[in-house]
Amino acid sequence: QGADICGEIVAVGDGVDAARIGQRVITDGWLRDPDDPGNMDKTGYYGSERDGGFAEYATTLAVNAVPITSNLSDAELATFSCSYSTAEGMLTRANVTDKDTVLVPGASGGVGGALVQLAKRRGARVIALASEAKHADVAALGPDMILQRAPENLRAALGGEKITVVADVVGGPYWAKLIDILERGGRYTCSGAIAGPMVEFDLRTFYLRDLTFTGSTVIDPQVMQNLVKYIEVGEIKPALAATFPLEKLRDAQAAFIAKRHTGNIVVIP
């Protein structure tokens, strides 16, 4: 949908300081009501409720163009906005700290890889699930342990690891096993269901083990500001899988659907 953009401001609208022209920015994809910015029911998303960035030029609200100073390329910076803000929003909602052990299914994906890096930044112990062919790429993100994508006996595969948080964008038929291995008082945070939204669940697992489930979609504006700080001081790094010229957008989308990549695919106008 072209939600992640990095570029340079070339023009501004009425009421916007002309000094912003020439400023390097990345986009905050969440469109908020300027009169009621805290109301989650009055939000849209860049590339959905507003035309996105699959273009040579794009427009956005001034508040959504976030200044950034970095030696990273535009293509590298374009990997951050959507995936990393989604991940940081999930970890923020789940109150992840250095006392947690976090399990990340789908760690080779854009959000999954961001979850690995951002949870490590918080000092948590991180265990990643990914297909064996992608283990080397995932290892570069810094998890403490990497397991197969969907071990038949997840508890045995984890050994003595005590999982306090599952940060998930996968869902699907494996979901119940993710919940089953959570420690008492554990937290499950979710912002996607790429393997399927319908799951079977025994509610007794939820209440007898005092679990907390948190959905995460609309992020607080401060999340994006925090991400920029992390990028500028080098605390997180881009996971750029491939680039395609804008005229090869169809090929880029086909590569994304094929899911043979690790990280994010970027289109360059």
Predicted regions, residues:
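NAD(P)H dinucleotide-binding glycine-rich loop of Rossmann-like/cofactor-binding domains
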Residues: 29-106
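Glycine-rich cofactor phosphate-binding loops and adjacent beta1-alpha1 units
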Residues: 127-130, 139-209
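Rossmann-fold dehydrogenase core element
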Residues: 184-191, 200-240
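Mid-domain Rossmann-like dinucleotide-binding core that forms the NAD(H)/NADP(H) cofactor-binding site
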Residues: 72-151
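Glycine-rich beta-strand-centered segment in the early N-terminal region that forms part
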Residues: 1-34, 69-71
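C-terminal hydrophobic helical "lid"/dimerization subdomain
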Residues: 89, 221-269
